[in-house]
A protein has these predicted regions:
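Hydrophobic anchor residue at the start of the ABC signature
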Residues: 65, 93
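Conserved ABC ATPase signature
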Residues: 51-55, 59
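Conserved ABC ATPase "signature" region
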Residues: 31-46
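A short, surface-exposed alpha-helical micro-motif characterized by mixed small hydrophobic
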Residues: 118-120
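ABC-type ATPase nucleotide-binding domains, specifically the catalytic core motifs of the NBD
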Residues: 5, 12-30, 42
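A short, proline-enriched helix->beta-strand linker immediately N-terminal to the Walker B motif
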Residues: 70-74
Length: 150
C-alpha cells in the first residue's frame, strides 16, 4: 500500500495481477470475483485489460486495495496507505477504505505518521516512539486532538 507505483508489476495486466492469487488458492469464479473487487473500489471491469502505467496513482492504489480484498481477509495491514498520493486522492482513498471496512467487517491495522489520517480512520490508536508504545488513544481523545505529537 505504501507505494502504489512499486506495488504492481509493470508488465502484467491488472487482470493477471488480480487473478493470480485466486488461481494459486484454487478459487472458483475468478472472473466474477475480479469484476466485483474492481467495482468495489470504483473501477470498471474493463480496467482489467490495462497495465499499471496506464493508471493514475489513485487508480493504482485502488487496484492494490482490490487485490487485498480478493482473499477476503479479516485483518488488513495499511502501511501509509495514502503517503504517495496528492491530498484530493488521499481523501477518496481513506473514505473508500472506511466504507470497505464496514461492508466487509474487517479490522485495519493502520501505520501512519499523519495524525489526521489516524483520527479519520481509527477507533483506537497507539503512539509509538523509538520502537515502543508511549500512549493509547480512544476515539474521544483523538477528536480532542490528544493524539498529536505537536
Amino acid at each position: 500500500f505504501q507505494d502504489p507505483y512499486a506495488s504492481l508489476h509493470p508488465n502484467h495486466t491488472l487482470w493477471r495481477t488480480l487473478a493470480e492469487p485466486l488461481k494459486i488458492r484454487g478459487e472458483r469464479e475468478i472472473e466474477k470475483r475480479v469484476q466485483t473487487a474492481l467495482e468495489q473500489v470504483g473501477l470498471p471491469f474493463d480496467a482489467a485489460r490495462r497495465y499499471p502505467h496506464q493508471l493514475s496513482g489513485g487508480q493504482r492504489q485502488r487496484v492494490v486495495i482490490a487485490r487485498a480484498l480478493l482473499l477476503r481477509p479479516q485483518l488488513l495491514l495499511l502501511d501509509e496507505p495514502t503517503s504517495a498520493l496528492d491530498m484530493s486522492v488521499q481523501a477518496e482513498i481513506l473514505n473508500l477504505l472506511n466504507q470497505l471496512k464496514l461492508e466487509h467487517q474487517m479490522t485495519y491495522l493502520l501505520v501512519s505518521h499523519d495524525a489526521d489520517v489516524i483520527a479519520h480512520m481509527s477507533d483506537r490508536a497507539a503512539l509509538m516512539s523509538e520502537g515502543k508504545i508511549q500512549r493509547f488513544f480512544d476515539r474521544d481523545a483523538m477528536e480532542k486532538g490528544e493524539h498529536r505529537m505537536d
